[in-house]
Swiss-Prot record:
Keywords: Ribonucleoprotein, Ribosomal protein
GO terms classed as biological process: translation
Cellular component terms (Gene Ontology): cytosolic large ribosomal subunit
Protein's UniProt keywords contain rRNA-binding: no
Lineage, broadest ranks: Bacteria, Pseudomonadati, Pseudomonadota, Alphaproteobacteria, Rickettsiales
Residue ranges, annotated region (Disordered): 21-40
Highest rank taxon of the organism: Bacteria
Name of this chain's protein: Large ribosomal subunit protein bL35
Keyword Ribonucleoprotein (UniProt): yes
Organism of origin: Ehrlichia canis (strain Jake)
Family membership noted in the UniProt record: Belongs to the bacterial ribosomal protein bL35 family.
Amino acid sequence: MPKLKTKSSVKKRFSVTATGKIKSTQSAKRHGMTKRSKRSIRVQRGTAIMNPSDSRIVKLFMPYSR
Protein backbone atom coordinates (compact mmCIF):
# COMPACT_ATOMS: atom_id res chain seq x y z
CA MET A 1 0.00 0.00 0.00
CA PRO A 2 1.44 3.43 -0.91
CA LYS A 3 2.17 6.13 1.59
CA LEU A 4 -0.65 8.52 2.41
CA LYS A 5 -0.08 12.17 1.60
CA THR A 6 -0.72 14.96 4.08
CA LYS A 7 -2.81 17.83 2.69
CA SER A 8 -0.51 20.83 2.42
CA SER A 9 -3.27 23.31 3.23
CA VAL A 10 -4.09 21.48 6.48
CA LYS A 11 -0.43 21.18 7.39
CA LYS A 12 -0.04 24.97 7.16
CA ARG A 13 -3.19 25.89 9.10
CA PHE A 14 -3.47 23.36 11.93
CA SER A 15 -1.24 21.70 14.51
CA VAL A 16 -1.79 18.81 16.89
CA THR A 17 -1.30 19.19 20.65
CA ALA A 18 0.32 16.52 22.83
CA THR A 19 -3.11 15.27 23.89
CA GLY A 20 -4.26 14.94 20.26
CA LYS A 21 -6.43 18.04 20.01
CA ILE A 22 -6.32 20.21 16.90
CA LYS A 23 -5.11 23.78 17.39
CA SER A 24 -5.46 26.68 14.94
CA THR A 25 -5.23 30.43 14.88
CA GLN A 26 -8.35 32.57 15.17
CA SER A 27 -10.04 33.50 11.91
CA ALA A 28 -11.52 36.83 10.70
CA LYS A 29 -8.49 39.04 11.37
CA ARG A 30 -7.55 40.25 7.89
CA HIS A 31 -9.51 43.47 7.48
CA GLY A 32 -12.32 45.49 9.01
CA MET A 33 -10.71 45.59 12.43
CA THR A 34 -11.63 49.24 13.02
CA LYS A 35 -15.26 48.29 13.62
CA ARG A 36 -14.41 45.79 16.33
CA SER A 37 -13.80 46.42 19.98
CA LYS A 38 -10.29 46.27 21.41
CA ARG A 39 -11.29 43.24 23.45
CA SER A 40 -12.39 41.22 20.42
CA ILE A 41 -9.18 42.11 18.58
CA ARG A 42 -7.13 41.06 21.61
CA VAL A 43 -9.00 37.76 21.97
CA GLN A 44 -8.38 36.90 18.33
CA ARG A 45 -4.62 37.10 18.80
CA GLY A 46 -4.53 33.71 20.45
CA THR A 47 -5.19 30.20 19.23
CA ALA A 48 -8.35 28.13 19.28
CA ILE A 49 -8.95 24.45 19.98
CA MET A 50 -11.22 22.85 17.39
CA ASN A 51 -14.50 21.16 18.15
CA PRO A 52 -14.00 17.34 18.35
CA SER A 53 -16.51 16.72 15.55
CA ASP A 54 -14.59 19.05 13.21
CA SER A 55 -11.20 17.78 14.32
CA ARG A 56 -12.04 14.26 13.10
CA ILE A 57 -12.19 15.61 9.55
CA VAL A 58 -8.88 17.46 9.91
CA LYS A 59 -7.17 14.35 11.30
CA LEU A 60 -8.11 12.43 8.15
CA PHE A 61 -6.03 14.89 6.12
CA MET A 62 -3.05 14.51 8.50
CA PRO A 63 -2.42 10.74 8.54
CA TYR A 64 1.01 10.86 10.22
CA SER A 65 0.28 13.34 13.00
CA ARG A 66 0.44 12.09 16.57
